[in-house]
């Protein structure tokens, strides 16, 4: 607990947006106030520099992995839903900022929406959930087709490497995951100790 708490404290000191669920960070990015994320950070003096924004947000996404690991290791609950939105929003924003830097003007907000939908669809293995949820939360129905395409691509990509979502992964590893396949479900619920006959006559 001490090591995890110390590690988390150092990360939050260097990258303040890692503190909390991340909804304030998402709101800042969607409202065009990304420079507020630099408050009390070591890159505060570069908060209006485009390259600094890309670097800072990329580091936040990278160290979010360690922050979540430290939280879980210290006995806390890092969650799945909020971190998915957090990382997806920042990733989409970074891609948009990078395209703007190289001379391709694109709206940051739209890319942030697509990033959230894509990451949520991949993590939860639920492309429709990612599409409709982001559209409902943000009112971005004009981007419905974009969100749908992003979600489907994310889902088709992740199932190649991981068959189960994070919610079902632990159950699958324990062999306790119930599926729509009736025979497999029955075999999953069946305890072998109750089936194997042990009272045998010795000849």
Residue ranges and their predicted role:
Residues 1-194, 198-203:
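Alpha-helical transmembrane segments and immediately membrane-proximal extracytoplasmic
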């Amino acid at each position: 607990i001490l090591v995890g708490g110390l590690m988390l404290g150092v990360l939050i000191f260097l990258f303040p947006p890692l503190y909390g669920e991340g909804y304030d960070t998402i709101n800042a990015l969607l409202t065009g106030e990304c420079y507020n994320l630099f408050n009390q950070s070591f890159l505060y003096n570069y908060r209006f520099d485009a390259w600094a924004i890309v670097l800072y947000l990329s580091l936040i996404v990278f160290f979010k992995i360690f922050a979540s690991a430290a939280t879980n290791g210290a006995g806390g609950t890092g969650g799945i839903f909020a971190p998915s939105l957090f990382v997806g929003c920042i990733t989409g924003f970074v891609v948009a900022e990078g395209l703007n830097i190289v001379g391709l003007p694109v709206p940051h907000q739209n890319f942030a929406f697509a990033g959230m939908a894509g990451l949520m669809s991949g993590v939860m293995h639920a492309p429709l959930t990612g599409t409709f949820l982001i559209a409902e939360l943000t009112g971005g129905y004009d981007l419905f087709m974009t969100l749908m395409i992003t979600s489907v691509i994310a889902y088709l990509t992740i199932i190649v490497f991981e068959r189960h979502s994070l919610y079902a992964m632990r159950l699958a590893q324990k062999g306790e995951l119930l599926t729509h396949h009736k025979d497999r479900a029955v075999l999953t619920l069946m305890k072998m100790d109750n089936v194997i006959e042990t009272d045998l006559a010795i000849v």
